[in-house]
Each structure stands twice: as C-alpha cells, then as structure tokens.
Amino acid sequence: MNRTKLVLGAVILGSHSAGCSSNAKIDQLSSDVQTLNAKVDQLSNDVNAMRSDVQAAKDDAARANQRLDNQAHAYKK
C-alpha cells in the first residue's frame, strides 16, 4: 500500500514537473514571439521610412535628368 502511494506520488510529481517545464517552454516561446513581433514592427517602420527616401531620390534624379536634357537640347540649337 505504501509502495503504491510512493509510486503514485512519484508519477504525479513527475507529471507536475513536466507540466511546469512545458509551461516554462511556452512562456519562453511566447516571449520569443513578442520579441520577433517587435523586430518585425521596427523593420516595417524602417522600410516605410526608406520608401519616402527612395521616392525623394527618384524625384531628384528625374529633375537632374531633365536639366541635362534641357542643356543637351540647348547645345543642339
């Protein structure tokens, strides 16, 4: 009887320990997901900021090309 209680107690304790271990892993994974979400948000913000910089560079290049075209046209006259 005592041996059965001891074995049963060991099984319960073992399964409880495994449950705590799983919860710790789940908590760690949840923390990792939150960290990755924060990084994705930061990268998304960086990409959006770069889009406006790229558009400004394209606009500057277009204006420079237009000036060069105007100068080339003036030399041909």
Curated annotation (Swiss-Prot):
Residues anchoring lipid (N-palmitoyl cysteine): 20
Coiled coil ranges: 26-74
SUPFAM superfamilies according to UniProt: Outer membrane lipoprotein
Ranges for the Sequence repeats: 23-33, 37-47
InterPro entries with a match to the protein in the record: Lipoprotein_leucine-zipper_dom, MOM_Lpp
Keyword line: Cell outer membrane, Cell wall, Coiled coil, Lipoprotein, Membrane, Palmitate, Peptidoglycan-anchor, Repeat, Secreted, Signal
NCBIfam families: PRK15396.1
Biological role stated in the UniProt entry: A highly abundant outer membrane lipoprotein that controls the distance between the inner and outer membranes. The only protein known to be covalently linked to the peptidoglycan network (PGN). Also non-covalently binds the PGN. The link between the cell outer membrane and PGN contributes to maintenance of the structural and functional integrity of the cell envelope, and maintains the correct distance between the PGN and the outer membrane.
Family: Belongs to the Lpp family.
Entry protein name: Major outer membrane lipoprotein Lpp
Organism of derivation: Serratia marcescens
Gene: lpp
